[in-house]
Amino acid sequence: MEITIEMIKELRERTGAGVMEAKKALEEANGDMEKAVTILREKGVIKAAKKAGRVAKEGIIEAYIHTGDKLGVLVEVNCETDFVARTDEFRKLAKDIALQIAGMNPQYVSKEDVPPEVIEKEKEIYRTQLKNEGKPEHVIEKIIEGKLEKFYEEVCLLEQPFVRNPEIKVKDLITEAISKLGENIVVRRFARFVVGED
């Protein structure tokens, strides 16, 4: 399939990739736009991993108040430079993350933030459920691991499916932004407020 300038332009707009990167990805994907995006994301993950160790001390605090003024979110999203913090792309990312928190009510930023005692309690609940269902002992641990992943998707912001595109997780959204903006990006912390709740 012939790769057109329009296809390259569209892929660049969607991913922030360079001209040659976009062209190569489209060629590799035989012109399939979605496959090309996946190829670039896979390559972008490598770029993002290289940037992950860099210190992110700049950034913004995004505030979101839901219609009706009964629900509000504050989220701190950090990057490496104030230049990136002022970009529309970074501000949109912070806003999307605030909307995610408002809609999906995560309890923690990442898996690493979940206290060990909470994980142990969940494992015990699953273990008891599975024994009561008569599951064989040798498969229980594997099932528990799968259930824990589902638990993380519910309570950890970075593991949640992104509300605007459930095909990707919030961490993938951040990885894409790291690739586009060329800086490490970190969700530092958040708070979600609901009128009448403690």
From Swiss-Prot:
Pfam families: EF_TS. Residues 81-84 are annotated as: Involved in Mg(2+) ion dislocation from EF-Tu. It comes from the Bacteria. GO terms for molecular function: translation elongation factor activity. It is found in: Cytoplasm. One of its GO terms (cellular component) is cytoplasm. Keywords: Cytoplasm, Elongation factor, Protein biosynthesis. SUPFAM superfamilies: Elongation factor Ts (EF-Ts), dimerisation domain (SSF54713), UBA-like (SSF46934). HAMAP family: EF_Ts. Associates with the EF-Tu.GDP complex and induces the exchange of GDP to GTP. It remains bound to the aminoacyl-tRNA.EF-Tu.GTP complex up to the GTP hydrolysis stage on the ribosome. Belongs to the EF-Ts family. This is Elongation factor Ts. The lineage of its organism: Bacteria, Pseudomonadati, Dictyoglomota, Dictyoglomia, Dictyoglomales.
